[in-house]
């Protein structure tokens, strides 16, 4: 692939990730729904999607996004991102999520498939060479305590809370 096309693809992917973040931050859930892949939209109606996100309002507040490494192969892309924000309920805490955003290109437009595990698994199974030079990682959640980022690890189902 010529360098100019690759750079253009990476730029388009970054632009899509930033646009989707701003839609989520501004609670523009209808537009956010339009950026989902066809497979996601076929499984969930716009009303159900919007309603689910509206129920989460007041629990967290997004503040900013850092976009890191972008890898594009054909109609697939993975982007390293860090989302910063605050948890407002049931406790107040500053937090960040280090997560890879998965995108698929459909009808010439990049669409974010990150929350759609079925699409992501299908994407990875169909493209085993994709993670060459780009390690696929699980999301990590951090909270700030005493000025330091501490990774939050929820108890597993086998652990008991005391």
Regions found by a protein language model. Give the residues of each.
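Exposed beta-sheet edge and beta->alpha loop/turn motif
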Residues: 72-162
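Short solvent-exposed beta->alpha transition segments
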Residues: 14-22, 26-80
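Repeat-mediated protein-protein interaction surfaces in helical alpha-solenoids
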Residues: 1-4
């Amino acid at each position: 692939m010529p360098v100019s096309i690759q750079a253009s693809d990476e730029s388009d992917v970054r632009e899509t990730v930033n646009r989707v973040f701003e839609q989520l931050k501004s609670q523009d859930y209808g537009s956010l729904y339009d950026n989902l892949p066809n497979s996601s939209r076929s499984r969930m109606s716009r009303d159900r999607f919007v309603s689910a996100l509206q129920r989460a309002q007041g629990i967290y507040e997004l503040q900013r996004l850092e976009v890191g490494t972008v890898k594009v192969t054909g109609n697939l892309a993975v982007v390293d991102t860090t989302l910063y924000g605050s948890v407002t309920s049931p406790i107040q805490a500053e937090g960040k999520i280090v997560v890879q955003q998965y995108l698929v290109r459909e009808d010439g437009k990049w669409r974010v498939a990150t929350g759609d595990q079925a699409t992501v698994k299908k994407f990875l199974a169909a493209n085993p060479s994709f993670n060459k030079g780009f390690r696929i990682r699980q999301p990590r959640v951090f909270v700030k305590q005493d000025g330091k980022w501490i990774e939050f690890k929820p108890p597993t189902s086998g652990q008991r809370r005391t």
